[in-house]
């Protein structure tokens, strides 16, 4: 299976530059150093998968000309990875259907606490008009499939919490990682491509 991977953002939780025009060690003269929060898009002939819904989601989807997604995978519930969830409403309107979200039980529980309204059905008076984002939660652990794409999920140490890494075909996306356990190391061994963000 051949997939196209688009990096929608590779910035830190504050983006680059951070508010206050803080560029850190990045050279502001290089336009590539203007970075949105971390997220990627994975596409093959039949399926489009988004990993993480950053606060920059609207701009990221506009930049990549995305008009539909088949699923969103969530690595963890820090604000820089889920606070774009409300922007799914506009995809709901275009696609005329709910969006499937895949995450661990703990992540789904935390998203439901913070974004409870996105899991509620549309009212009958709406006549199918998506006046709010509508998401269907799918709990994951280990291997699962989205259409024809096989995905392996695994837990990663993110300091005071965990994040979920995803292996798709011979590629893995490991965001916000402090360290890997032996199980994760076995999963990411002998890949063609590893995208990793160590934090």
What residue spans do the PLM features occupy?
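Cap/insert and terminal regions of metallo-dependent hydrolase folds
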Residues: 179-199
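Binuclear metal-dependent hydrolase catalytic cores
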Residues: 1-174, 178-186
């Amino acid at each position: 299976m051949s997939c196209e991977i688009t990096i929608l953002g590779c910035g830190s939780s504050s983006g680059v530059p951070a508010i206050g025009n803080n560029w850190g060690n990045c050279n502001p003269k290089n336009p590539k150093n203007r970075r949105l929060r971390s997220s990627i898009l994975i596409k093959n002939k039949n399926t489009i998968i988004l990993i993480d819904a950053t606060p920059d989601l609207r701009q990221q989807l506009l930049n990549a000309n995305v008009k539909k997604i088949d699923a969103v995978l969530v690595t963890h519930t820090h604000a820089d990875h889920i606070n774009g969830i409300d922007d799914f409403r506009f995809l709901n309107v275009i696609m005329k259907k709910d969006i499937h979200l895949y995450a661990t039980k703990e992540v789904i529980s935390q998203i439901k606490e913070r974004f409870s309204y996105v899991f509620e059905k549309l009212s009958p008076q709406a006549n199918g008009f998506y006046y709010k984002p509508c998401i269907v939660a799918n709990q994951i652990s280990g291997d699962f499939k989205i259409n024809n794409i096989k995905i392996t999920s695994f837990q990663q140490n993110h300091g005071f919490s965990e994040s979920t890494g995803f292996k798709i075909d011979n590629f893995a996306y490991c965001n916000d990682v402090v360290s890997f356990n032996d199980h994760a190391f076995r999963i990411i061994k002998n890949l063609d491509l590893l995208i990793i963000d160590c934090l």
